Each structure stands twice: as structure tokens, then as C-alpha cells.
Swiss-Prot record:
EC number: 2.7.7.87
Catalytic activity field: L-threonine + hydrogencarbonate + ATP = L-threonylcarbamoyladenylate + diphosphate + H2O
Biological function: Required for the formation of a threonylcarbamoyl group on adenosine at position 37 (t(6)A37) in tRNAs that read codons beginning with adenine. Catalyzes the conversion of L-threonine, HCO(3)(-)/CO(2) and ATP to give threonylcarbamoyl-AMP (TC-AMP) as the acyladenylate intermediate, with the release of diphosphate.
Organism of derivation: Xanthomonas campestris pv. campestris (strain ATCC 33913 / DSM 3586 / NCPPB 528 / LMG 568 / P 25)
SUPFAM superfamilies attached to this UniProt entry: YrdC/RibB (SSF55821)
GO CC annotation: cytoplasm
Family to which the UniProt record says this protein belongs: Belongs to the SUA5 family. TsaC subfamily.
Location(s), subcellular: Cytoplasm
Keyword terms, alphabetized: ATP-binding, Cytoplasm, Nucleotide-binding, Nucleotidyltransferase, Transferase, tRNA processing
Superkingdom in the source lineage: Bacteria
Protein name per UniProt: Threonylcarbamoyl-AMP synthase
Length: 187
């Protein structure tokens, strides 16, 4: 995705603590700046999702997460497995440092991270230059939207912006796997 005024507007919205909708690999997502507690709590309130569940973050690279993830806690084989699938449609639970905020990790001792190859997500992460929350654009318990037209109007009324684009070709949201144990948490 080329750098566009819509991308600039999305970044500006994130910078002021706003919540945006954007297409991901399989469904539309909601995003905000995970470093801003108020933004994350507002996003979770919009979705009716409890904070203890935690959220996925997407990023342009692990470098923007260095204060939150403890890569040294992974063995070389574990790290190789993670890096072999990025950028791509794979979410990994990574070990965290003490600086990882609870409003992002929830009641978990790991952080769900994806380095996406989806053109909109990748461009947004690059332009933003920081981690970004990525959670499905739906109310908790409802099916996620697979197109902009399917976004709940009540949800759209409560967010601050939409970055247009198409979802990728995945039939289901990205799989989630724990890098420490290899356990598949969502297939």
C-alpha cells in the first residue's frame, strides 16, 4: 500500500489516542496505540472485551517491541521458528519483560505479536513506527466483520476512523502459537 492521505489520517488518529478500524489477513480489526492505557481501555470497552484477556499487537518489526518482549528468554530453535513465519499471518505468544503493560497482556505472562505481510497492516505499522493493537472489529461474542460493509454501524459510530482496504485471503483469523512451548492456542 503506498503512503496516502488516508494512511496519514490513521496515524494522526492513533497519535491522539483514537481507535481505528482496518482490514487484516482474514477479518477487519480495531486498533489503537497500546502504549496509551486510556486508548486500549476505550477500545476494550467498545468491544465489550475484558482487559484480562489481553490483545494482539502488530508491528513492523521486533525492534519496536524491545521494551516489552524478552527475546533472550527464547532458545535459538524457538526464535528461528518464529522468525521463519514473519512477516506473515502468524501470531506468536512471546515472553515479556516487566515493562509490558497489563492492559495489553491481560492476565497472561506473554504478549501476542504478529509481524504482518498484509499490505494495509504492514504499511500502517511502518508509517506508525510503533506497536499497534489488532483485535477483531466486532462486539465480544459476535462474528468478526470480513468486509467494510459488514462492520457493525453501532461499532463504527464509536470509533475515530477507518483505513480502507481489503482483507487478505485467510478463511479464519491468524493462528496463535506460544513460542515458548509450541502449543497452538488458536488454529
Amino acid at each position: 500500500m503506498p503512503h496516502t492521505p488516508d494512511l496519514d489520517a490513521a496515524v494522526a488518529t492513533l497519535a491522539r489516542g483514537g481507535v481505528i478500524a482496518y482490514p487484516t489477513e482474514a477479518v477487519w480489526g480495531l486498533g489503537c496505540d497500546p502504549r496509551q492505557e486510556d486508548a486500549v481501555l476505550r477500545l476494550l470497552e467498545i468491544k465489550r472485551r475484558p482487559v484480562d484477556k489481553g490483545v494482539i499487537v502488530v508491528a513492523s518489526g521486533l525492534d519496536v517491541l524491545q521494551d516489552w518482549i524478552d527475546i533472550a528468554a527464547l532458545g535459538s530453535e524457538q526464535l528461528t521458528a518464529v522468525l521463519a513465519q514473519w512477516p506473515g499471518p502468524h501470531t506468536w505468544i512471546l515472553p515479556v519483560t516487566a515493562q509490558a503493560p497489563r492492559w495489553v497482556t491481560g492476565d497472561h505472562d506473554g504478549l501476542a505479536v504478529r509481524i504482518s505481510a498484509h499490505p494495509v497492516v504492514a504499511a500502517l505499522c511502518k508509517a506508525w513506527g510503533a506497536p499497534l493493537v489488532s483485535t477483531s472489529a466486532n462486539l465480544a461474542g459476535e462474528p468478526p466483520a470480513r468486509s467494510r460493509a459488514a462492520l457493525d454501524p453501532a461499532l463504527l459510530a464509536r470509533i475515530d476512523g477507518v483505513l480502507d482496504g481489503e482483507v487478505g485471503g485467510l478463511a479464519q483469523p491468524t493462528p496463535i502459537r506460544d513460542a515458548r512451548t509450541g502449543q497452538i492456542l488458536r488454529d
